[in-house]
Amino acid sequence: MQFLIVTGMSGAGKSVALNFFEDMGFFCIDNLPPALISKFAELCLHSELDKIAVVSDIRGREFFNALFSELSSLEKRGIDYEILFLEASDEVLIRRYKETRRRHPLDEEGRVLDAIRKERHLLEEIKGKANKIIDTSKLSKQELNHELKKVYSSYFIGKQSMSVTIISFGYKYGIPMDADLVFDVRFLPNPYYVRSLKERTGEETVVQDYILKWPVTQKFYKRFFDMMDFLLPEYSREGKSHFTIAIGCTGGKHRSVTTAIKLKEFLLSKGYHVVVEHKDISK
């Protein structure tokens, strides 16, 4: 089990980090009271959860007394954990609070800088126990995601972090609105005009064999699959955790369906989690 505790300065990006880990398949909890950490970890041990990330920070008030005793309890129970600590400069934190117009959890007199300095002092000890410290002062949300992916790449070894949805559709019924990329395969040979194939669909081998036997299909599939093999890792590096590819033909029953199925087979061989939806196959 991978158990990650995310903590650090308020406004330093803990919510961004938690969203990243959730997109990467972690079970995530925000603002977990420190006193519940060891009990929660124990529950996770007896579940099917294998990757857990929790945010526990100064919002828990009785932060240090509870947190350090909970970490000690984890160690006694033999539960491995890591601590990620996020910080940023006073100037950046003040600017972020002004931009969001949110109140610092320790700000009782309207002095944000005093609250930030107090929090920094209180967090000094837990910072010293952190496995990884990231200063987000000069990082955008996207850049923080890049850094997290780099730092925690070992958590995803052997797995593609991006999931892919492939939608086949018919242009006569409209293009899916949620597609990231749309491909038009109406140039491929059309089984609709073959009497024995007209009422069949691209899910059937006989239709697939017809489409695949043509050189234009074979050339297109090679180039298409090579392009997706190049593009998806690049989109993943830009922070996308899910990608939707729409493939259209005239009616959405033959060419687009076959192409979606063959693309799925290719992406599965590359380790991606793939879901296929044939939007118009029954129309």
UniProtKB/Swiss-Prot annotation:
<comment type="function">
    <text>Displays ATPase and GTPase activities.</text>
</comment>
<feature type="binding site">
    <location>
        <begin position="57"/>
        <end position="60"/>
    </location>
    <ligand>
        <name>GTP</name>
    </ligand>
</feature>
<dbReference type="InterPro" id="IPR027417">
    <property type="entry name" value="P-loop_NTPase"/>
</dbReference>
<dbReference type="InterPro" id="IPR053931">
    <property type="entry name" value="RapZ_C"/>
</dbReference>
<dbReference type="GO" id="GO:0005524">
    <property type="term" value="F:ATP binding"/>
</dbReference>
<dbReference type="GO" id="GO:0005525">
    <property type="term" value="F:GTP binding"/>
</dbReference>
<feature type="binding site">
    <location>
        <begin position="8"/>
        <end position="15"/>
    </location>
    <ligand>
        <name>ATP</name>
    </ligand>
</feature>
<keyword id="KW-0067">ATP-binding</keyword>
<keyword id="KW-0342">GTP-binding</keyword>
<dbReference type="Pfam" id="PF03668">
    <property type="entry name" value="RapZ-like_N"/>
</dbReference>
<dbReference type="Pfam" id="PF22740">
    <property type="entry name" value="PapZ_C"/>
</dbReference>
<keyword id="KW-0547">Nucleotide-binding</keyword>
<dbReference type="InterPro" id="IPR053930">
    <property type="entry name" value="RapZ-like_N"/>
</dbReference>
<protein>
    <recommendedName>
        <fullName>Nucleotide-binding protein Hore_15880</fullName>
    </recommendedName>
</protein>
<comment type="similarity">
    <text>Belongs to the RapZ-like family.</text>
</comment>
<dbReference type="InterPro" id="IPR005337">
    <property type="entry name" value="RapZ-like"/>
</dbReference>
